[in-house]
Swiss-Prot record:
It comes from Homo sapiens. It comes from the Eukaryota. It is found in: Membrane. The gene is APRG1. The keyword Membrane applies. One of its GO terms (cellular component) is membrane. The keyword Transmembrane helix applies. Keywords: Membrane, Transmembrane, Transmembrane helix. This is APRG1 tumor suppressor candidate. The chain crosses the membrane at residues 150-170.
Length: 170
């Protein structure tokens, strides 16, 4: 049964200004699936707090995911296992063929968060919280072809919120 807060959060008008807060709408969704068959709902609801391997639908030992997995890809932090083994590799996080994936450059972190595009300018916040502006389609080249972005049309003629779910989608 939904709580009062969940009910209120899920009753958003598609034409009203509150619709721009797409994160609230995403939190209403029951399930997010990945290609590896994982259920991402709990990982999204955690909103940056610790998520275990089971919550994220990942294969492998839970000790490899002792912090929110996105941090491993965006900030290059080492897990306790990496520190103990003296390795710079990052756990594959359920992906095939990426057992020794190196740390991804910080600019990818910017595009792993919500980004608002208005009049050709992409606005977002990087891992360090600093605001960034990227003109045109530069974000596409930085992310690379395998990454998938979901664009949602919002209220207003030029407003688009791009929610980067590519890390989860593989």
């Amino acid at each position: 049964m939904k709580t009062m807060a969940t009910r209120k959060r899920c009753k958003l008008s598609r034409t009203g200004p509150e619709f721009e807060n797409v994160i609230k709408r995403l939190l209403c969704a029951r399930t997010f699936h990945t290609r590896i068959g994982g259920d991402l709902t709990h990982g999204i609801i955690n909103r940056g707090r610790r998520a275990n391997a089971e919550q994220m639908g990942l294969q492998g030992s839970a000790q490899h995911f002792n912090i929110f997995p996105l941090d491993l890809w965006t900030q290059g932090k080492k897990t306790e296992v990496q520190k103990r083994e003296g390795t710079d590799s990052i756990p594959a996080a359920g992906r095939s063929g990426t057992a020794n994936q190196p740390s991804i450059a910080p600019h990818r972190c910017l595009f792993s968060r919500g980004i608002t595009a208005l009049d050709g300018l992409k606005r977002g916040r990087g891992c360090n919280g600093a605001a960034h502006l990227v003109r045109g389609d530069a974000w596409k080249t930085k992310l690379g072809e395998p990454w998938v972005s979901i664009a949602l049309a919002l209220a207003g003629p030029g407003a688009i919120l791009i929610l980067e779910l590519s890390w989860f989608l593989g």
